Structures are given as structure tokens and as C-alpha cells.
């Protein structure tokens, strides 16, 4: 496991930290605190702006009433960028939920951005900015 001083995170009373598998760009963790659970994304050796595009995407989804984790904090500690989110437990999805999400995402992709192009005004793919 990557060594990181978790005591510097803006969370009080951290009790347990568990790695979560599945990501290919970031290290991910479940963080249990006294009365709350968090999802921590950590990117070693990067500046605090590493997660800026992800944050703008989450805000865009929130504006479209798509439930996403609440953004708690982001920053840089010990030369590592982090993104701290609300932890959402696994749930059950139903066919109607998939249909609704598909329609919302399709409508989002129809919109033209400030550059008079489809999609977001910035092109970001898994840790690198593409031009």
C-alpha cells in the first residue's frame, strides 16, 4: 500500500482506511470516520489541480439532477493530490433507472459548449489533457 499521512486529511476521527480496487489512474480508498464514510481518490506526485476536470464533470452531472457523490474536499498533501467524496454504498439498479440515465446523458451530449463544439469545453482523458 502507498504510504501517505492520512492524519493530514480534513477528516476528524479516522478509524479505518481500506483500499478499493478497480481504478486504473488513481489509488482509491474507503475511509471510515466516527459518523461518516468517505471515498478518497489519491494521485501520487501530482498537484492539487489534478482533479479539477473531474470536479467540473461532477458539478455538471449535479446540475442535470444526476445523483453523484457530494464533493467534500480536494487538495494536495505530501506532494499528492486528493479528492474526497461522500461514500455511496452499492445499490440495486432497475431497468427504468438505466433508461432515465441514458436519456439524461444523451441530452448532455447534444449540447454545444462555449467553443461551439459538442461535449465539454476541455478534453480530458484519464490523467492527461488531450489536444
Swiss-Prot record:
Keyword NAD among record annotations: no
UniProt keyword terms in alphabetical order: Plasmid
Presence of the UniProt keyword Repeat in the record: no
Pfam families hit by this protein: Fructosamin_kin
InterPro entries xref list: Fructo-/Ketosamine-3-kinase, Kinase-like_dom_sf
Protein name: Uncharacterized protein in ileS 3'region
Amino acid at each position: 500500500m502507498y504510504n501517505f499521512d492520512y492524519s493530514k486529511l480534513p477528516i476528524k476521527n479516522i478509524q479505518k482506511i481500506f483500499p478499493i480496487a478497480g481504478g486504473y489512474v488513481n489509488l482509491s480508498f474507503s475511509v471510515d470516520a466516527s459518523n461518516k464514510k468517505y471515498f478518497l481518490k489519491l494521485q501520487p506526485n501530482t498537484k492539487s489541480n489534478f482533479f479539477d476536470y473531474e470536479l467540473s464533470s461532477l458539478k455538471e452531472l449535479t446540475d442535470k439532477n444526476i445523483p453523484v457523490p457530494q464533493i467534500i474536499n480536494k487538495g494536495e498533501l505530501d506532494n499528492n493530490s486528493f479528492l474526497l467524496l461522500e461514500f455511496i454504498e452499492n445499490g440495486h439498479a432497475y431497468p427504468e433507472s438505466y433508461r432515465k440515465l441514458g436519456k439524461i446523458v444523451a441530452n448532455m451530449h447534444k449540447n454545444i459548449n462555449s467553443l461551439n463544439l459538442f461535449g465539454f469545453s476541455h478534453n480530458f482523458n484519464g490523467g492527461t489533457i488531450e489536444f
